[in-house]
Amino acid sequence: MVGIESFKVMIAPTWVPDRRNAERMLVATLQSHVSNRLSLPDPAVPGQALAQADTPSLVLDLDVFEANLGLMQQWADRHGLALRPHAKAHKCPEIARRQLALGARGICCQKVSEALPFLDAGIRDIHISNEVVGPAKLALLAQLALRADVSVCVDNMSNLHALAAAVAQVGARITVLVEVDVGQGRCGVTDDHDVLALARAAEAMQGLRFGGLQAYHGAMQHVRSHAERAAMSAQAAIRAAGYASLLRAYGITCERITGGGTGSAEFDAASGVYTELQAGSYAFMDADYGANEWSDTLSFGTSLFLLSTVMSTPAPERVVLDAGLKSTTIECGLPRIQGRPGLVYAAANDEHGVVRVQDGAQAPALGEVLKLVVPHVDPCFNLHDTLVTYRDDTVVGLWPIAARGLSR
């Protein structure tokens, strides 16, 4: 759209007597455009019934959420570990603030860009629990390190040199954690020589400080059997302890051994190997974690739901919801309908969720609002701008999911 000043320049050479009239007409046109522009309202208003919220909306039961936060913090405190919750789970600074207020040491982010809204929110202890490769990302990481206490993972000598060059260029300082593969089969070194070489190099390079090891095993988090997860956690801890012992044998201090997740926190904390836990989903839970076996020692409630409205009732055995693939991901299975036995979320399309009504179940009415347990918390948060919080089915507030879409 042409601005007023640009329009003045365009009409200046001609029609001089009519310039003021033309400017007035343009201003009136612009004002009309602004006044007629439609803005998307917030999905909910504090004080209203949760069922009146617009859908699809991501909603958080504050009572269950706060209980989950307290339980994990108490578990970490009991075992003398720091809790560094993973912000990739929620991408919401307001959630991180509450975790820090309960005693969390800092946060994890998976990407450098993801950390920026948390920096803006005043959070100053950030671990990038990933390798950062490429000039643009390293330059941004160096700028982040000028403004916060930042650590990052490295598993490659070439990347370590590039990191050192980036921080040296701006005079920053960053802590390096060597990532070791403790069974995940993803990133991380496995050779003792590589672990030792990277730690020594990090100690020697200007602007870098060797801080310890990243030893995360994501694959075990969703192993259904409680006993199998315990065994896998024990093996991962043995590997991590072995690498730490190697470094200490060569006179290298290993301050931090960071890792662990929601599915393994019970065992990781009790292992005596880790110094901090990186769990994130514990605050919310999802259908995938809900399928795990849990002990009474450490189990969490479901606090996060996707609110969805019945938009069509085409057949007695089938209704259609307004929440599909653009509201939830399905790589970990389909959503589960909360509190409505006999209703099965059977298929997801872009903007439709097809629900099968089993024999004997009561079909929901057109316009009825249902709660869905999402299959996988992390990517679901990334699909939404706002988190609606509530207590006793009454809306309390709206929290921006400020880091959604920040995956660079």
Language-model-detected regions and their locations in the chain:
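C-terminal accessory subdomain/extension
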Residues: 313-408
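Active-site-proximal beta-alpha core segment in soluble small-molecule metabolic enzymes
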Residues: 86-222
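A charged N-terminal "starter" segment
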Residues: 4-140, 404-408
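Conserved, mostly hydrophobic/aromatic
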Residues: 65, 88, 118, 178, ...
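Active-site loop/helix belt of alpha/beta enzymes
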Residues: 175, 181-294
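Active-site loop ensemble at the mouth of alpha/beta enzyme cores that anchors a bound cofactor
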Residues: 229-231, 264-341
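Glycine-rich tight-turn/loop motif centered on a GG-T
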Residues: 50-62, 124-128, 142-152, 224-234, ...
